[in-house]
Amino acid sequence: MNSNFIEFIQDVLITIHENIRDLKERRSFADPEELAHIEGKLLAYYEILSALRSSATEFKIPHDQIGL
């Protein structure tokens, strides 16, 4: 697999995981209205990760090779 492509996917995954971590931290002191927004964003990030895992499996790309 092209090394630029792998670096790109890994960069995207790092960003997603950083955003998840930040949202989990914010969740601990969020007001109820913001909490609903945070939970929605977390769910969206988890769905993206799930889709990436499924696609990687379908295309026979080893998860560890791209950082899943």
Can you name each region flagged by the protein language model?
Residues P32-Q65:
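Short, charge-rich amphipathic interface segments used for partner binding and complex assembly
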Residues M1-A30:
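N-terminal acidic leader/helix
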Residues M1, I66-L68:
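Short intrinsically disordered terminal tails
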